[in-house]
Amino acid sequence: MDQGTMGYQFENWATTYSCEPELYFEPTTVEEIRQILELANQRNKRVKVVGCGHSPSDIACTDNYLVRLNKLNRILQVDKERKWITAEAGILLSDLNEKLDALGLALSNIGAVSDVALGGVIGTGTHNTGIQHGILATQIVAMTLMTAAGDTLECSNTVNREIFQATRLHLGSLGVVLNVTIQCVPAFRIHLQQFPKTLTEVLGDLDTHLKQSEYFRFFWFPHTDKVTVFYADRTNKPIKTTSSWFWNYAIGYYLLEFLLWISVFVPRLVPWINRLFYWLLYSAKAEQVKRSDKAFNFDCLFKQHVSDWALPIKQTRAALEQLKDWLDNNPNVRAHFPVEVRFVRADDILLSPCYRQDSCYINIIMYRPYGKEVPREGYWAMYEEIMKRNGGRPHWAKAHSLLRQDFEKIYPAFHKFCSIREELDPSGMFLNNYLEKTFF
């Protein structure tokens, strides 16, 4: 058995959270995972499984045992007739996408980042956009996990169904996910279209946009009424990409980071920067054709703070208008672009932000140019207040201020999930500070 490594330091991608676990493990077999859990039981230690550290919160942090499943990354089974793929939980989506493409398959929807582990990305409710599509976990048809007692447990819509409703968004609190079976679709290409609008126009015609494009989303540029609309739809057209190092990186990365760094010292520049980059990169019509996963992924640029809440889709207009009005009436508060707005179908996953409601996700961002912190407290607090006012639920992977008493009010199935968690992990082996605030 891997005896674990001492002195390992974990830091998330955004470098906003870190920890130094007592022992760090990279098991290579299911039996080694069982031995790690046995050791933790013997020594009364807690265990956290971490993926690639993309979550902008402390959800993966622990000072006990940290386990990474990156060496458990195989495809175990391919059911060509049903288009089901069973893969180990440590496989990266980027690797899975390539293997699926070689099989003539694809996932029907994925998030913005593919350098993430399969078992982790479903555990926090990762989503993309498309009102016909649920969060990523809705594509899961079966899972196998190991409980704190070292038992393996299979679940699906027909086997241990209630546990399946919980494990598809598990928060790392139910056990160690061993493998996942995913419903795939035939490989497809995406026609991407980008065009300018105003926020007033988009909100006034929201239903039309939702019907017009399968994967519709938009960027709003705070301190302006400017919006860039993105349509993404399946196509048989040949691949056609337009990539420019100058515009994408010299301007869209390096110049932007430099100007945002200057704005730390001259905050009044932020509205000007938002307008400038809208004009430089987002004000013109553009179109491309890409392989589906390449179309869904995009560059998250440099280090950042983000917050992302889902609210009932009928509250989209009210929430964005309230946020815009507040920023307009508080000129000393600065907000970076973009505010990204996406749409997701309802589901029956117990802790899904989309539980039993079609949802709009509103994601705000404040960059940390060259690692420099930017004032954001007032913006963050008012954003959360507006989201709460409009029936919002926070993205589990992203930092928020809610506690158990809040979740009890906004999640009808919260107590049901808690009962399942207590049944599978009665001693709290898989808890950490993040989860204690959630469940206690």
Curated annotation (Swiss-Prot):
Its EC number is 1.1.3.8. InterPro entries: ALO_C, FAD-bd_PCMH, FAD-bd_PCMH-like_sf, FAD-bd_PCMH_sub1, FAD-bd_PCMH_sub2, FAD_lactone_oxidase-like, Oxid_FAD_bind_N, Oxy_OxRdtase_FAD_BS. It catalyses: L-gulono-1,4-lactone + O2 = L-ascorbate + H2O2 + H(+). One of its GO terms (molecular function) is FAD binding. The lineage of its organism: Eukaryota, Metazoa, Chordata, Craniata, Vertebrata. It is a single-pass membrane protein. Its cofactor is FAD. It is found in: Microsome membrane; Endoplasmic reticulum membrane. The chain crosses the membrane at residues 245-267. Pathway: Cofactor biosynthesis; L-ascorbate biosynthesis via UDP-alpha-D-glucuronate pathway; L-ascorbate from UDP-alpha-D-glucuronate: step 4/4. Residues 17-187 form the FAD-binding PCMH-type domain. Gene3D superfamilies: 3.30.465.10, 3.30.70.2520, Uridine Diphospho-n-acetylenolpyruvylglucosamine Reductase, domain 2, Vanillyl-alcohol Oxidase, Chain A, domain 4. One of its GO terms (biological process) is L-ascorbic acid biosynthetic process. Pfam families: ALO, FAD_binding_4. Keywords: Ascorbate biosynthesis, Endoplasmic reticulum, FAD, Flavoprotein, Membrane, Microsome, Oxidoreductase, Transmembrane, Transmembrane helix. The keyword Metal-binding does not apply. One of its GO terms (cellular component) is endoplasmic reticulum membrane. The modification Pros-8alpha-FAD histidine is found at residue 54. It comes from the Eukaryota. Belongs to the oxygen-dependent FAD-linked oxidoreductase family. This is L-gulonolactone oxidase. Oxidizes L-gulono-1,4-lactone to hydrogen peroxide and L-xylo-hexulonolactone which spontaneously isomerizes to L-ascorbate.
